[in-house]
Design a protein with these regions (language model features):
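N-terminal intrinsically disordered, cationic/polar leader segments
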Residues: 1-135
């Protein structure tokens, strides 16, 4: 016998910023805080270069890459800096972050970024980004 039960296993992050780059960096910092609420600083610098056909897919690919690199390099990405440009129909993100070794911190696992309720919106005060992660 079994029963299906509703279960929420998500965490959402909102970033409000004057610039698109600050909003992307804010969402990435939110991802770091969702992993570990402690204030952390990494020592090893990592570089990212991501291209996509929309801002939503660029945001998804950026966060997905941070989760992937967390798993591959066993570091929690922190202190994110990004530059975003558009050339024709293609958006490009170049960025850096510092990695905190996972074996030195207590953290919960964020499994994946989702498109569920994702929002990338220009506002009168700058930018609003909203992302839901599976935990």
């Amino acid at each position: 016998e079994f029963h299906l039960r509703d279960h929420t296993a998500d965490i959402a992050v909102e970033s409000l910023a004057l610039t698109l780059e600050e909003a992307f960096s804010g969402i990435a910092e939110g991802l770091s805080q969702a992993h570990s609420p402690n204030s952390l600083s990494g020592t090893k610098k990592f570089h990212l270069n991501i291209s996509s056909e929309s801002l939503e897919s660029l945001l998804f690919d950026f966060l997905d890459m941070l989760i992937y690199e967390r798993d591959v390099y066993n570091v929690l990405p922190t202190n994110h800096k990004v530059s975003i440009t558009q050339k024709g129909d293609i958006w490009n993100l170049e960025g850096t972050y510092y990695g905190v070794p996972l074996d030195t911190i207590e953290s919960r696992e964020i499994k994946a970024v989702t498109y569920s309720d994702m929002e990338v919106k220009k506002t009168p005060n700058g930018w609003r980004l909203y992302v839901v992660f599976d935990v």
